[in-house]
Amino acid sequence: MALHQSLLDLSELAPHCQSRATARGLLAEAQDILRNAVAHQDNEIELAHWYSRLITDIVRSPGVNSPVHLTGAAARGDQLPSIPVVWMGDDADLQEVFADVGLQAHAATDSIAARVDAGLPLGNGGEQALLEEALGQRPPALKMVDGLPDRDAAVDIKATLLSPIAAIARWAAPGPRPTVDRLAIGVERDLLTTADAESLDLAWRTGYALELRRWYEGVSDRPATLRDLPPLDRTAYGSACRIVSAAFESISRRAEEYK
């Protein structure tokens, strides 16, 4: 699905931003346009790619000219407004540019994941370290009551879906590229089975749709339980959690076999 012209028009302005005040205006307008795109049910992954590129172009533009290296979701092409923008390096004023329009942003904690997402060299033993870090993020199983997911169980889309899947994808294909692309490359590298990659891709897209919808509704930063989700979202979230749990079990088992 092609992006709406309003998105394309704004993305053309970003690299030519001439001041940090203009940057704030572009970031604010981007959120308005993104809300319209969500309302029209545009593709969530394409919207994340667009938003990531916009953030990157603004940070590198003449008016901002920040010396930092973006990492995390923005560097991968996975950025959403509800996910903090993170970077490596120092720029005391950059956080304020984002905060002024209601966006979270800060310097990243130095880690192998941050370095990989920023496009820095992995180093010896790096892939094993990424695998161990990813498997350490395996989400807990959904609590069940009478054979059904406990409706009082906490919902944390980032912690139970997005972060674990991004971590596995980072191990499968280190380098600053979108998570869905990393998963596909992981199959080519024979680190992921086709079934595991497809399952994680589905869970990732589900998580992105849910996260973007909660941002659109203005509740993405509020604590929530399964009971708070609409029935279809509740079912989708539960299914995605089970998919991720099964995929992590499969990947962990394969990793043990290759030791």
Name these PLM-found stretches.
Residues 59, 63, 69, 76, ...:
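Conserved catalytic core of two-metal-ion nucleotidyltransferases
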Residues 36-45, 83-88, 149-153:
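Glycine- and acidic
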Residues 42, 52-91:
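Active-site nucleotide-donor binding segment shared across nucleotidyl transfer reactions
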Residues 1-66:
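N-terminal regions immediately upstream of nucleotidyltransferase
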Residues 34, 126-259:
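Conserved nucleotidyltransferase catalytic core and NTase-mimicking acidic/glycine-rich helix/loop elements
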Residues 6-17, 23, 27-30, 34, ...:
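Generic structural signal of hydrophobic/aromatic residues within well-ordered alpha-helices
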